[in-house]
């Protein structure tokens, strides 16, 4: 189990998790606000 937690804390795994989270966040923002450039303030 110690080796598995060491593997999960390596840079490629952390980067992949962070990129997946960021991509999902951007997709959901674009789903609820489809074209933010069209907003007129």
Curated annotation (Swiss-Prot):
Record keywords: Chloroplast, Membrane, Photosynthesis, Photosystem I, Plastid, Thylakoid, Transmembrane, Transmembrane helix
Transmembrane segments: 7-27
Gene name in the database record: psaJ
Gene3D superfamilies named in the record: Single helix bin
GO biological process: photosynthesis
Organism (species): Oltmannsiellopsis viridis (Marine flagellate)
UniProt keyword Zinc-finger, yes or no: no
GO terms under cellular component: chloroplast thylakoid membrane; photosystem I
Function: May help in the organization of the PsaE and PsaF subunits.
HAMAP family: PSI_PsaJ
The organism's taxonomic lineage, starting at the top: Eukaryota, Viridiplantae, Chlorophyta, Ulvophyceae, Oltmannsiellopsidales
Membrane topology recorded in Swiss-Prot or TrEMBL: Single-pass membrane protein
UniProt keyword Transcription regulation present: no
Pfam families tied to this protein: PSI_PsaJ (PF01701)
Compartments where located: Plastid, Chloroplast thylakoid membrane
Protein known as: Photosystem I reaction center subunit IX
Similarity comment: family membership: Belongs to the PsaJ family.
